[in-house]
From Swiss-Prot:
Residues in Peptidase S1 domain copies: 445-684
Gene it is expressed from: MASP2
Result after altering residue 444 to Q: Abolishes autocatalytic cleavage
Free-text description of this protein's post-translational modifications in UniProt: The iron and 2-oxoglutarate dependent 3-hydroxylation of aspartate and asparagine is (R) stereospecific within EGF domains. Activated by cleavage after Arg-444. The uncleaved zymogen is inactive towards synthetic substrates, but has sufficient activity to effect autocatalytic cleavage.
Organism: Homo sapiens
Record's protein name: Mannan-binding lectin serine protease 2
Amino acid sequence: MRLLTLLGLLCGSVATPLGPKWPEPVFGRLASPGFPGEYANDQERRWTLTAPPGYRLRLYFTHFDLELSHLCEYDFVKLSSGAKVLATLCGQESTDTERAPGKDTFYSLGSSLDITFRSDYSNEKPFTGFEAFYAAEDIDECQVAPGEAPTCDHHCHNHLGGFYCSCRAGYVLHRNKRTCSALCSGQVFTQRSGELSSPEYPRPYPKLSSCTYSISLEEGFSVILDFVESFDVETHPETLCPYDFLKIQTDREEHGPFCGKTLPHRIETKSNTVTITFVTDESGDHTGWKIHYTSTAQPCPYPMAPPNGHVSPVQAKYILKDSFSIFCETGYELLQGHLPLKSFTAVCQKDGSWDRPMPACSIVDCGPPDDLPSGRVEYITGPGVTTYKAVIQYSCEETFYTMKVNDGKYVCEADGFWTSSKGEKSLPVCEPVCGLSARTTGGRIYGGQKAKPGDFPWQVLILGGTTAAGALLYDNWVLTAAHAVYEQKHDASALDIRMGTLKRLSPHYTQAWSEAVFIHEGYTHDAGFDNDIALIKLNNKVVINSNITPICLPRKEAESFMRTDDIGTASGWGLTQRGFLARNLMYVDIPIVDHQKCTAAYEKPPYPRGSVTANMLCAGLESGGKDSCRGDSGGALVFLDSETERWFVGGIVSWGSMNCGEAGQYGVYTKVINYIPWIENIISDF
C-alpha cells in the first residue's frame, strides 16, 4: 500500500507526457477554529474530503483537547463515511462510554470522508481543540475481513486505484471479472471403465460453469453408471433443480436433471455412448458428484484350457474385447493344427464368439540328435525317444578321441534343444588324443633307424617346391618350419600334404590340402632362422587312427624333459649318409646340447648367418653322425613326457651345418615352447 502523497511527489519529479496520468495528490491538515488557541462556544465546522475512485482517506490526530461529556453530547468531532458514523470523539482520553482518538488512525469506507466539529454554548474550562492530518491512499480490495466472501474466486491482484482477478490453469475468468468458470467441456472417455467427477471434487465445485463429459465405447458395449461416495448439488425445496443440475443423455433417453444430496440409483444405459452435462450458477457452496462407470456386452463361451495348459487371466465371464491367453506347462508347446505357435491370445467379438479356435499343448520334441563327428550317440530314456526330459549320451571313438569340456550327457529341454548338464546347446567336441606312439624309448642313442607303423603317426610329408616335413596338430593343423613353406605362403593350395604312410613314394597315403599358411611375423627369409615356425590349416579334418595321430604341444612343465643331454627323437625322409632322400621314414635319437656350447660352435666360420638365439635349441653328438638333414626341415623333434606318457613336440627341424652330422656341429631346432601363445592364438582365430 502506498500513500497518494508519495505518488504525487514522485510523479511531480518526472516528465512523462506519454505515460499514465496519475491522480492529483490528496492530502492536508485540519484544525479547530483558533487552534492552537482555545476554540469558542457555539461553533460548528464541517469538512468533506474526497479521494479518486479506488482510493480511501486516512486521518489521524496530532492534538486533541475537547470538553468531555457523557456520550460526547456537548463538544465533539464526528467522523462519517457515507451513511456510517465511524467515530464520535471528545475529551482527552477514552473512558468506558466516551472515546478520544489517541494514536488511532481512521479510514474511510469509500472514497469520501466527512468530519464535523461542534462546540456547545458554554465551556467551564478553556479547551484548545484539535489538529489532524489526512491523505488519500490506495484501497487493497484483495484484503477481506474474516467471514466475508473473497473478492476473486482464485487470484486477486491489487494495483493503485483498483484490482483484477485471474484464474488457475483449467479455468477461465467469467465476464463478471470475478468468478472463475471451469474449462470442463469436451472431455471424452474411451476406456471400458473409469471415473469422472465434478471439478474440484470433493471440494466445492466452481460457479458459473458448464461441463460436458462424453463416454464413447466401441459398438457392442453398454455403459453402466454408478454414483459413488457422495452427491451434493444445489437444490430448491419447491422447484426441480433450478440452480445447478446434472443431466445424462444417451441415444435412447435422457436421465435427470439431478440435484440435492441423495445418490442417484445405478443407470444401465443400454448404449455405448453417453453425454453427461453439469451446469452451475453464480452462488452456492456444494461438493458435487462422482461417477464410476463400467461396461458390459454379450459374453463369449467360457474357455476350457487344453490338456497340459492353462488359461490366463481367469475371469467369471468374458465379454467384447476381453481376451485370454493359453500357456502350456513346462515341456509342452502350443500347436494350432500342426503349426507351432510362439504365443496364443483369443479376443471376444461383439457377436459373442472367439476370434480363434483353441490350440493344443503338445509335448516338446527335440527331434533326432545331430551326429557327432568321430563319436556316437546312445538313447538312454528309450529307443528313439526325443521328447521333453529324454536323455541321450554322446561318446567319442575310443583310443584316438577324447571328449572335450562336458560329459556328453544331453537332455531334451523345454525350449526344444538338446542341452548338456552345463547348459550348452552345441555338440560336444571329440578332440583327437595326441602323443600316442607304438614306440617306447629306453634312452639309448642310436640313429638311422627305419620307423615302423605307428611309431610317428604325427609325421607329415610336405611336397611343394622342395620336400619337407611337418607334424600334425589336432586334426586340421600342421606345424612346420617357416623356411620350408615360405614360397607357398600366398599359394597354399600348391602344397601337397601326405600323412599315414612310411614310404615316401608309396601310393597308399592320406591326402590333405592346405587352406592357408601362417608364417610367424618375426621370421625374415634369407636373414637367419629366428622365429622359424609356421602353421598350415587344412581344408578338412583328417580321420585319426593308429597311423595318423596328432603330436602334443608342450606343457608349461615340459622344459624339465628338455634339459641338456635329455634325449629327443627326430624323424623324416631327408638326405641319408649316401646323399639321397630316404625312401622309408627314418628316425634318430639325439641328446640336447648345452645352449652356450652350441652357440660357440656356430660363431666360427664358415657360418656367417649361423646365429643361435634364445628361440632355438640344439641337439646332436659332438662326434657327429647323428643328425637331421635337408628334406627333414619342418619335422618335429619329439620328447616323451614321462608324467603323461605322451609324446610332445619340443623342436622343429630348422638349420645346421652344411654337412649334416658333421663333428663339432649340431642340429638347430626352433624351440616350440616359446611359441605356445602364438600357436594358440592362430588356431583359435582361424
